[in-house]
Design a protein with these regions (language model features):
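Conserved N-terminal phosphate-binding loop of PLP-dependent enzymes in the Aspartate aminotransferase
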Residues: 1-148
């Protein structure tokens, strides 16, 4: 499943799989992978424009470097673990109270982060692919300051 960068803010996602797996869900349930809202032309046009932009500016080529920068900068005694892949990262703290306090402090300084519904001890960092290295530095500095 993919959706974050695909629509450039418009509601669209993609269900991508091998032929073997797609064949296995053909009838159990029948076409269980389709939606009732899929394929709207405006959203598809936005998706196409987003993909063109991502390719033109080679945004995927820079994701590993940006992930490494986040991981390098996000070091603090209150951070138990950093998980994730690319620009979809999780910062584990001791408890939800710490997560909520950190989120509120970050918001006061213009940085929007969230938590995971399935793991409330973790901050969710998922910036757009266009985030610059200087913005990553600002975000990390704000998070670290908010943890103090």
């Amino acid at each position: 499943m993919s959706a974050k960068a695909l629509g450039g803010g418009m509601p669209i996602g993609a269900f991508i799989s091998s032929s073997k797996i797609m064949k296995s869900i053909e009838d159990k349930p029948i076409l269980g992978h389709i939606t009732t809202f899929g394929g709207h032309p405006v959203c598809c046009a936005a998706g196409n424009a987003s993909l063109n932009y991502i390719e033109k500016y080679q945004l995927l080529d820079k994701v590993s470097e940006k992930e490494a920068l986040f991981r390098k900068l996000l070091v603090h005694p209150k951070i138990k673990k950093t998980s994730g892949k690319g620009l979809m990262l999780s910062i584990e703290l001791d408890n939800f109270d710490e997560v909520e306090r950190t989120m509120k402090r970050c918001m006061e300084h213009g940085v929007i982060i969230d938590w995971f519904l399935y793991n409330t001890n973790c901050l969710r960092i998922s910036p757009p692919l266009i985030i610059s290295n200087s913005e990553i530095h600002k975000v990390c500095k704000t998070i670290l300051k908010s943890l103090d």
